[in-house]
Amino acid sequence: VCQIVAKFPPSISRMLGGMMIEMIQNADLSILHAIQGTASPALDTFMVGFTTLGEFGALWALLAVSMIASGKHRSYGFAILAAIALVVVFGEIGLKHLIARPRPFLLDPSLATTLIDLPSSYSCPSGHTASSFAAATVLCLAPLAHRWLKPVAVGTACIIGFSRLYLCVHNPTDVLFGAVLGIACGVAAVAIVRKIAEALQNRKAQA
């Protein structure tokens, strides 16, 4: 689609690009309104709880610290911290300011929630989702003895991402982009940590 749009004169390309962005935004807002139709006091409490767990990647950072402190899968604990750091650098510092997408409640004030403090930063990608999927990806790549922890981590990441939609602080495409970014950061962090561990082992072997 992008190649087709690029073949048009610049003015038409900009117009078509703007139409595509508007279509995506309208679809995002429609999905958010549909999700709002499922709201209930019980879900309010549940979603606020999960979105709080994902704040600043706190849940995953605590898990990483516990892995490092216990000595079990220590390198993967460091990988989780590295993955979250990559999300901060590329997502929060880089892409959010590059894309500069407004929050959905700024485009449609009827979506503004009173359940949490409304964030003032840009919307895309979702940092909660990115850090959660980054950590979950690391755990999926780790040789954990308790394999059930892997689907639990992925499920938790999905719920945290959905909580951002339920609270209408992100668009669906923000959350999708955040998940993709998180997976990429998780894979990259594991690769980096494994390379470092391999280099340290080789150095010890040569000593």
What is the meaning of each model-derived region?
Residues A112-A207:
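Membrane-embedded catalytic cores of phosphoryl/pyrophosphoryl-handling enzymes
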Residues G49-T52, Y76-A85, L176-A179:
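Loop-to-helix transition at the N-terminal end of transmembrane alpha-helices
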Residues L63-S66, L86, F90-L95, I99, ...:
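Alpha-helical membrane-inserting segments
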Residues L63-G91, K150:
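Interfacial segments of alpha-helical transmembrane regions
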Residues T38, A42, A69-H73, H97-L106, ...:
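Membrane-interface elements of multi-pass transporters and channels
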Residues S11-A58, E92-S121, A207:
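N-terminal transmembrane-helix/juxtamembrane module of multi-pass inner/ER membrane proteins
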